[in-house]
A protein has these predicted regions:
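A structural signal for multi-pass alpha-helical bundles of membrane permease subunits
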Residues: 1-217
Length: 217
């Protein structure tokens, strides 16, 4: 059981951390563009594009089950960590974009204008000026993404069979011929929750700053 737990724990850790980092990186770039530039895609403007990202959360996971199952089977991504990382990145990306868009909107544009006058490019101003200021929001988005991906069960149970199974799938499988093994399930659940509690305590000040950013003007 110990070896099985460690294997599932590392699967969850690798998948959750990688997908959260990827989502925060991509989401921050998208959110910065939506907060600073005026886009037009057909009839859609910035606000419509932002709402489109948020509307992806309306779809229940079961609606996406069959398409992803067929797609992953054709791409040989079933029961792989990279498959879960890509899927989890897509699932938390809309939330990251909304959090970071509000974060970037609360930062004065004069800072970037001054950086451009000093000779920096837009990308240089974003990476050296804006990102350090927006760090609390990025940490908050990372923690939220980490919690959501760490606790995700449906797709992990659907798209994995042995190698890439995660901790929630192992916790849910604590059943036998005599029913549910409550002691084992309780111990595994505590072990699964503990890392998130430790991370939240360590990064508490960033979470508070990030979630409060943009609340007042």
């Amino acid at each position: 059981v110990r070896e099985e737990f460690l294997k599932r724990f590392w699967n969850s850790a690798i998948v959750s951390v990688c997908s959260s980092i990827l989502a925060v990186g991509l989401g921050s770039c998208a959110a910065y563009g939506l907060s600073r530039f005026n886009y037009r895609f057909g009839f859609m403007r910035n606000s419509d594009i932002s709402f489109f990202f948020l509307s992806q959360l309306i779809l229940p996971p079961v609606v996406l089950a069959l398409p992803f199952l067929v797609l992953y089977k054709s791409l040989n991504l079933l029961d792989t960590r990279i498959g879960l990382i890509l899927l989890y990145t897509l699932t938390v990306l809309p939330i990251v974009i909304w959090i970071m868009r509000d974060q970037f909107s609360s930062i004065p544009t004069e800072l970037e204008e001054a950086a451009l006058v000093d000779g920096l490019s837009i990308w240089g101003a974003f990476t050296t000026i804006i990102m350090p200021i927006a760090l609390p929001g990025m940490v908050a988005a990372f923690i939220l993404s980490l919690v959501l991906t760490w606790n995700e069960y449906f797709f992990a149970a659907l798209l994995t069979s042995s190698h890439a199974k995660t901790l929630p799938v192992m916790v849910a499988s604590q059943t036998g011929s005599q029913g549910i093994s409550w002691w084992s399930m309780a111990a595994l659940s505590f072990a699964a929750i503990l890392p998130l509690i430790v991370i939240a305590i360590i990064l508490e000040r960033y979470i508070i700053k990030g979630m409060a950013a943009g609340a007042v003007k």
